[in-house]
Amino acid sequence: MGKNWKWLAKLFAFFGVCVGLFGIGTFSQVNGIASAINGFFDPDNAHCVKILPFLGEYSWSVVIASLILTVCVAAVLIGGVKRIASVSQIVVPFMAILYFAFAIILIICNITEIPAAIKVIVTAAFTPKAVTGGSMFVAMQKGVARGIFSNEAGLGSAPIAAAAAQTKEPVRQGLVSMTGTFIDTIVICTLTGLSIVLTGAWQVEGLEGVEVTTYAFQQGLPFPPAVSSFVLMLCLVFFAFTTILGWDYYSERCLEYLSGGNLKHVKVYRWIYIFAVFIGPYMTVSAVWTIADIFNGLMALPNMIALFALSGVVVRETKAFFKKQS
């Protein structure tokens, strides 16, 4: 695109730092972890404590979760304790398989309800009320927002990691990166969505975020509710923890670009990032999602401009790659 477009790269990098610090990287992840842990250990919020005068009361499980998470993240980012990150990366694939297995079991146990569930999904999306009332556009907006949160498609974050790969074929690396979007959205999100609709969890009032999935697993699986809740909590903790570390890497690279390679800024940023991890559990779910959606959109905008501008290059390189393979 040329040097005249450097401003777009800087804009992308700036919003990349914001997404890492306020969006996908910290607030939403630690808030989800704290919510899952609280749902398992203290679902009724029977044991609350007040940690600061200007804050409300929070369950002891939320407070302990925020402290442990902060210490673990600080140990990796500041203390260089890479073993924690290494263990998480080893365990996460097994957690993904376990989550997949539980979702499949739930669907099999409720297989007779699948036609009704699909009917609910389709009719809710295309009823005259949904179309004329504008709720269809709201659903589309929510779908795009949650899709970005799930697979980061169009966000521009995946190329930051892909750029570190040792490969002579950028197209091959792009194809590898695409599999993440397919697995996240087409497989995992479809299984989760079906689980929620099959068990009626989406209709239960007062449930937010991970609480909806927890309720679905508790109601739909042939295991004691405590077992289902514990497994889901464990999966979420490892998924979210590795995401926190991953987004620190993404946002650090963005900051490094903005600062011209000055690592002093990166060291300061790590402490700010750790503080964001600490305060995330004390935010409301609605605030967390709103902030994440805003910064996701802002980061995606310059990336989408670049994608459209470079689409010709992508097509040319892709054709050349497949021609070479044949």
Sequence positions of predicted segments:
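Membrane-interface alpha-helices at helix entry/exit sites of multi-pass transporters
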Residues: 1-11, 46-55, 167-183, 261-270
